[in-house]
Amino acid sequence: MTKFIFVTGGVVSSLGKGITSASLGALLEARGLAVTLVKLDPYINVDPGTMSPYQHGEVFVTGDGAETDLDLGHYERFVRMTMSRRNNYTTGRIYENVIAQERRGAYLGNTVQVIPHITDEIKRCICAGADNAQVVLVEIGGTVGDIESLPFLEAIRQMGVELGREQTLFMHLTLIPFIRSAGELKTKPTQHSVKELRSIGIQPDVLVCRLEHPLPESERRKIALFTSVPERAVISAVDVDSIYKIPLELYAQKLDEIVVEQLGLETGPANLTEWQRVIDGLEHPHDEVTITLVGKYVDHREAYKSLSEALIHGGIHTRTRVNITYLDSEEIEAQGIGGLESADAILIPGGFGERGVEGMIIAVQYARENGVPYLGICLGMQVAVIEFARHQAGMKEAHSTEFSEHTPDPVIALITEWRRADGSIERRDEQMGLGGTMRLGNYECELLPGSRAAALYGQERITERHRHRYEFNNDYRELLEGAGLVMAGTSFDGNLVEMVEISHHPWFVACQFHPEFTSTPRDGHPLFNSFIRAAAEHRRRVTLKSSRDS
């Protein structure tokens, strides 16, 4: 019988519901339970695929090609269960489903209303996301009291009534602010948040209180008294320097034990060996490197969430402290390469649109000419190909048709069709809406025997996740290979170039796919592990040269 844990938030947004849910999921998984998570987002967009990175942050792509909330990235980094499109639902998608059913006559002429039709669809989607797991953590986006969240809160209230206390648990996150001028913690916002939740008909079983300092026992008792939550279930969630410490912090307060007891789950003790190993790798580095990330959305770090975490994972698995410097590619265009000179390695991530592209090309040239390790991802591979074509293959006006429609040498162009692993053909054109023109999800890639890519992966066939519209133009393949660009990876049918590298460079690898989506703190990822090692080696070479010169 599947158990459901509903996670809500109050007082303010961005309290860390996703991280808390994922951390509790990790603890329950460590007890031997099959755990999955579902995110319910209250916005009306069908998915975040066409939303601005500045508003929404990263779009996390699942293996089945769904464009989802970045919290699903946290879920996959903390639990072993792979997420899919059934793990993220928005208000827009819920209403789209209901309206489609109404058009088909599924409601037999009844008036379609929020209750019961929308709430029933929400409950159906939650159960669909359960995917035979023993425990499902359901995170409700937004803040209690927001009008947008009301249908979701009503749906989980109904599930609590229908399934009963032995099958459901409600966990509420709140903020306990510290007023520095008074030197006091204030619990009143938490009391009012719980009051608001109870007015909807939901009594929380667990309170997770976000704060800067540990919660004094006197304040814990006060909160328990005014919210009717057991004192031991008032959890203190203190700020930590790494999100990967949170499972151990919650374990120390016996959150998993509280949950297991209420839900009547029979499990063994939590085995946290893997998480202890992660923390050991974080806290006892042997090296230190600075990675310069050259991007378009650097003012909003959430746009590169999986990428920054993947770099940290590489540091954990190579025992290297990773410092990430974010550099706006437009700044390179305006001020030159000064911001690159302290980099032990350079990374250019994905992105869309012409803005800042020339700055990225300058950064690629700097890395190639100065032997600085370079990793290009998605757009980062495309600008690497453009730079190589311009400066190594004599095509001075080479470009992508995304940025220069009439370039004489379109080394990157919109692909109109490709063959899937099942043999089917997928097609698209420039007239399709933005939501339907992407190559999304898992695709197989064949690696060139003897290439750096094959060596670092340790195999010649891999599966990685994609999110792009433009691709390497095969009309230029022979010419660029002749100039020294290695086509290190291709789609399984050989038609699409998925990876390129430069063999005579210390470490220059670029890929069309997004390896950051499959990197985890416990397992790392071969590309990022190798990239961090290369950065550390480059740092040692530069340090040795400087000492000799002095």
UniProtKB/Swiss-Prot annotation:
Kindly tell me the pathway this chain contributes to.
Pyrimidine metabolism; CTP biosynthesis via de novo pathway; CTP from UDP: step 2/2
Q: Where does Mg(2+) bind?
A: D71, E139
Q: Tell me which domain of life the UniProt entry assigns to the organism this sequence originates from.
A: Bacteria
Q: Per UniProt, where does L-glutamine bind?
A: Y54, G351, L379, G380, M381, Q382, E402, R469
Family in the record: Belongs to the CTP synthase family.
* Annotated stretches, region: Amidoligase domain: 1-265
Q: What modulates its activity?
A: Allosterically activated by GTP, when glutamine is the substrate; GTP has no effect on the reaction when ammonia is the substrate. The allosteric effector GTP functions by stabilizing the protein conformation that binds the tetrahedral intermediate(s) formed during glutamine hydrolysis. Inhibited by the product CTP, via allosteric rather than competitive inhibition.
Q: What is the lineage of its organism?
A: Bacteria, Pseudomonadati, Pseudomonadota, Gammaproteobacteria, Chromatiales
Q: Which residues form the Glutamine amidotransferase type-1 domain?
A: 290-541
Kindly provide the name given to this protein in its UniProt entry: CTP synthase
List the cysteine pairs that form cystine: none
Q: Which residues bind CTP?
A: S13, D146, I147, E148, K186, T187, K188, P189, T190, Q191, K222
Partners and quaternary state? Answer: Homotetramer.
Q: Respond yes or no to whether keyword ATP-binding is given for this record.
A: yes
* Originating organism: Nitrosococcus oceani (strain ATCC 19707 / BCRC 17464 / JCM 30415 / NCIMB 11848 / C-107)
Q: Which InterPro entries match?
A: Class_I_gatase-like, CTP_synthase, CTP_synthase_N, GATASE, GATase1_CTP_Synthase, P-loop_NTPase
Q: Which residues bind ATP?
A: S14, L15, G16, K17, G18, I19, D71
Q: What else is known?
A: CTPSs have evolved a hybrid strategy for distinguishing between UTP and CTP. The overlapping regions of the product feedback inhibitory and substrate sites recognize a common feature in both compounds, the triphosphate moiety. To differentiate isosteric substrate and product pyrimidine rings, an additional pocket far from the expected kinase/ligase catalytic site, specifically recognizes the cytosine and ribose portions of the product inhibitor.
Q: Name one GO molecular function term.
A: identical protein binding
> Any one cellular component term from GO for this entry?
cytosol
